[in-house]
Regions:
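Short amphipathic beta-strand and strand-loop transition segments with alternating hydrophobic
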Residues: 1-2, 97
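N-terminal first-folded block
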Residues: 2-40, 45, 82
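A structural signal for short, well-ordered beta-strand segments
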Residues: 12-16, 60-62, 93-97
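Short, charged/polar surface micro-motifs in flexible loops or helix N-caps
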Residues: 19-21, 67-70
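A short linear hydrophobic-aromatic micro-motif
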Residues: 43-49, 93
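Short, charge-patterned binding micro-sites
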Residues: 47-67
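C-terminal structural segments of small proteins and small subunits
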Residues: 68-104
Length: 105
């Protein structure tokens, strides 16, 4: 029998507004930069999950996993700070942290 392991997941739902985007192409360029930085610098898995056809809005789902709730909370805080610094007035973030046991029932 395998030993029990601590496993946690952080899920962030990120709502962004791009007031200066004049086209889908402009929004997608900005969004690609944000997604690349989150993934490359912070190891976050990111997907666009809403408002793909709107010029000035986007909703992203971001996730991270870890073996320590404290470490995962710190990583989530860093992601939020990065986004709020980049989009101080046009970003809203919802965060959920849970253990694997909570998710799997």
């Amino acid at each position: 029998m395998a030993a029990e392991a601590d496993a946690y997941v952080a899920l962030l739902l990120i709502h962004l507004h791009f007031p200066d985007a004049g086209s889908l192409k402009a929004k997608r360029k900005d969004l690609a930069s944000v997604k690349a930085q989150l993934h490359g610098r912070m190891g976050v898995s990111v997907a666009e999950v809403g408002h793909q056809d709107l010029w000035q809005r986007a909703t992203l789902a971001a996730s991270m996993t870890g073996g320590s709730l404290r470490v995962l909370e710190g990583a989530s805080d860093r992601v939020e700070r990065f986004l709020l610094e980049r989009f101080p007035e046009s970003c809203r973030i919802e965060r959920t942290l849970a253990s694997f046991d909570e998710i799997s029932g």
